[in-house]
């Protein structure tokens, strides 16, 4: 326990606000529970912010680019080889139109269901108390029910630190330019 701190009592906590966490939190709220989400980073978790969704957005943009340059040629004889890719505009679309729209929608749903959000990293003190640690403070939450819906983190392979030409999945989604070659390890 944090010395001198008294735990705030809550009914149900959900650790993580990604697709597993926010859906569980909303369902628990619909069933009448008072729910508190504990989130270390951005609402929507890894998947909506720096994982599945932005990856699929970039893949979709790549398919659109390829289609503009190749698909029509073989079907109707239409020549359309002049398409170009504005990578900065693609990144802006991914971040503003896809990620921000979806995470904003999740935040609105959480607010609609009166779900409290506590920012920080949860660490269990015992089977009914978590210590929520943020950059500038920590506080205790005593709970009746807990759902753990944490995301993932990339791990560094010894000898391949994330710097320079070696990037993790988050770095790959925000590269300043489209690489000519790319090796993916894991997945």
Residue ranges and their predicted role:
Residues 2-9, 26-33, 38-178:
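Glycine-rich flavin
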Residues 94, 186-187:
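NAD(P)H cofactor-binding loop motif with strongest signal on the N-terminal glycine-rich segment
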